[in-house]
């Protein structure tokens, strides 16, 4: 489904569109449901025929043949139920998988700005809890609705052929019940949306607490986390109680309706018998059909709850799918290729969310192969400037270009293919060391991965581990030391081998000896490539081609180490302060 379809189509049309690729299974499910309804309708008629004709006329042979046919019909009914249960759930799972695939693919298109504003736990709830409810609606919803309506309509038709006055009583009561269902469903839907929101909150609290469990234990704040979770859990429990209260009212009304229907049929039927207008056999047949009504009506009640819950999840899914990416490729975007590495910022301004100013009138020209070190006080805009180069965010004013092409004029994929980044906060996937390094180049051979590990000074550490490259790194790499995580991230970049490098405190977690070893590897890697290094340890960037000093979102100074020391400005002050601290 295309993105524009989510913008233009109704929620229900979006939902039904997922049935299309699996319509054969859906049709099979509906056909089996129809056969189940037919068998349920036949039994009262067979009973009536037996009492009217077969037994009074001593047609015992015919009676037992009919009973055998009924047994066979119920065998077929059981088979139909198996198909409904097995293949119906298979249909639901396939719909769920398609929806989840679309949602995950859409999340991949959203920019940093979206994830800055939304918590991971809430997104996890959309991908799991909400989709489960949508799946249940996809499978059971149409099936329950179809069986119920087919049984009710079929039963009414038969009842009108038996005694129209009794059938009229039932027909009058059914619309009243439908009105009650509609009114209560709206209330159920409102409460269900509140429950969904609370589930997302509690999922977020769990994700946050488990991710930060080491921090909580380090501060002995387990009680604080428990209190935060308990508060979220209480809010969830309250919303769930409201939902069950509404469901309880609905169920009570439904059971009352069913009882009134039975009483009304017996009362009117009894009156007709007293006046010689109805016999006992037809009243018994009617009672059997009233019993046949109970199951589909209960299914309708179940459908009302399922629809309310599933629709709430469906609305949340659609809302997320309608979220436009902050960054889009231009319709005529070019594929960036043959990158030399020239970077030009022309009167560049940037503000987060359009109002939090970070960079002001930045002018910068980086020639191909130049190594630029970016230093300055924390919060000055160093990392932000480097995040604009791979277009994680768009500039607010001015322009940023690579090899003369504005980064907004090329595809994001081709742009980022030519840039290698080692971020300050290293993220490793919960997988093996091998797969984490291979992430830099999914098609890499084992020999290439081993060479990248050697150049990143992590090979010996890996081989000393019991499982070598197949060692599991833990959640976010928690089973490795900080330096090991950093070097695995660096190995990814060696493997990717891009023409532009961005190193954001890439050696910050390394000890002095390892840092010294890897610095020469960085120097070798930087040859012939454009390299931007964000550094707080000024001693590591003395050999940079040029050093930029960024403070308060502006380039305040630039030059070589010697030139900036002679200037005796911000850089000289930072360098002198660090030198004194080391001694």
List each language-model region with its residue ranges.
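Short intracellular "coupling" helices and adjacent cytoplasmic loop segments at the cytosolic face
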Residues: 2-5, 93, 101-133, 204-228, ...
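Membrane-integrated ABC transporters
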Residues: 1-40, 55-66, 84-92, 99, ...
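Transmembrane helix-loop-helix hairpins at lipid-water interfaces of multipass membrane proteins
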Residues: 20, 26-80, 160-165, 276-280
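ABC-type nucleotide-binding domain
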Residues: 329, 336-583
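A hydrophobic transmembrane-helix motif
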Residues: 42-44, 48, 73-76, 142-185, ...
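An intracellular "coupling" helix at the cytosolic face of ABC transporter transmembrane type-1 domains
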Residues: 21-24, 112-113, 129-138, 142, ...
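Cytosolic ends of transmembrane helices, especially the final helix of ABC transmembrane type-1 domains
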Residues: 221, 245, 293-320
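Hydrophobic transmembrane alpha-helices
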Residues: 69-76, 206, 253-256, 260, ...
